């Protein structure tokens, strides 16, 4: 596990360097567009998480041998989606190294990312 963590940390550092190099060759407008595109990809991932929640509920209903009531379904759906969003989206959007890198590139981009993280929380 330790070696895996070290390898992942190296990837993150390399990714930051690559992003900085790309940004140095980009106009402010291109950087803003890249952040917009990044957020669109996040929206696509969120759609996948919403679909996964529906699959999870179907699996749960089959496992317990009965359908959930509307209230139960809404409660499970809300909790599961919040959990997935935090795990796969919000934790990354709020990661300190990521937010510092974005702040260096685009303060307005950081604001949009922070707003997105809050909306998903």
What residue ranges belong to the model's regions?
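Non-heme di-metal
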Residues: 1-121
